[in-house]
């Protein structure tokens, strides 16, 4: 609705949750809720528990990453029954942007063998190993090493094209990675509450705005 820059500003605490532009985002979301676009009791399912709705034909689409492809294939859906599309443009005046989090490796600050850990890190992020690890028959993800090869997989290729050329507005992480932890926690609770009780929007936004004033 508002684009990448607005998202970053909201995540940084620079925009009020009661801003009319935030409300417009929820208004767009409310249209989907009111038309019954979500399965019943959606708030109770993990992403793994939601996949059978796709497999059994009880849901037509799911907003999820490439990691869901392997279990969907294992459940019996071949590529003739699966497809991928980028989230639709809501405002033609706003450049398309995407959420595409990057998974990272870390060495604990109190690790006892940091030198060997660093060598392992160099090994695992090498172009060759990133190609192997992220192949379609392995993790099925896009490698983080720019010199790695992207496996010739239908969905990996589509994801690569989307992030490299079809997201001119920018690429962000997930909500709970972009926002400070405390704000993200309260924000997620508010978003989940809205999906079940959309009439609570004013109360939700006031609560999140109060949290913004305290957290930032």
Model-based region annotation:
Residues 47, 64-69, 101-103:
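Beta->alpha turn/N-cap motifs
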Residues 41-55:
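Short helix-initiation/N-cap motifs at beta->coil->alpha
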Residues 1-11, 26, 34, 99-108, ...:
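Periplasmic solute-binding protein
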Residues 12-43:
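Glycine-centered hinge/linker elements that transmit conformational signals in sensory
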Residues 35-37, 74-140, 189-192:
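Extracytoplasmic/periplasmic substrate-recognition and gating elements
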Residues 85, 135-186, 193:
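Long, aromatic- and glycine/proline-rich binding clefts that accommodate carbohydrate-like moieties
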Residues 56-64, 80:
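Alpha-to-beta junction loops
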Residues 3-24, 74-77, 89-97, 148-154:
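Short, solvent-exposed loop/beta-turn-alpha elements that line the ligand-binding surface or hinge
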């Amino acid at each position: 609705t508002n684009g990448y820059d607005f998202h970053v500003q909201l995540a940084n605490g620079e925009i009020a949750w009661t801003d009319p532009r935030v409300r417009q985002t929820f208004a767009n979301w409310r249209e989907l809720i009111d038309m019954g676009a979500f399965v019943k009791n959606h708030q109770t399912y993990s992403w793994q528990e939601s996949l059978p709705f796709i497999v059994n034909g009880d849901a037509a689409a799911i907003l999820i990453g490439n990691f869901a492809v392997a279990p969907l294939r294992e459940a019996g859906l071949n590529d003739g029954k699966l497809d991928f599309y980028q989230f639709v443009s809501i405002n033609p005046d706003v450049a398309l942007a995407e959420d595409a989090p990057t998974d990272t490796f870390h060495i604990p600050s109190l690790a006892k063998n940091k030198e060997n850990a660093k060598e392992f890190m160099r090994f695992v992020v090498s172009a060759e190993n990133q190609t192997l690890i992220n192949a379609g028959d392995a993790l099925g993800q896009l490698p983080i090493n720019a010199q790695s090869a992207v496996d010739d997989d239908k969905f990996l290729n589509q994801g690569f094209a989307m992030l490299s050329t079809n997201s001119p507005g920018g690429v962000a992480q997930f909500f709970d990675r972009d926002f400070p932890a405390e704000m993200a926690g309260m924000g997620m609770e508010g978003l989940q509450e809205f999906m079940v009780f959309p009439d609570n929007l004013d109360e939700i936004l006031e609560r999140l705005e109060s949290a913004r004033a305290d957290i930032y």
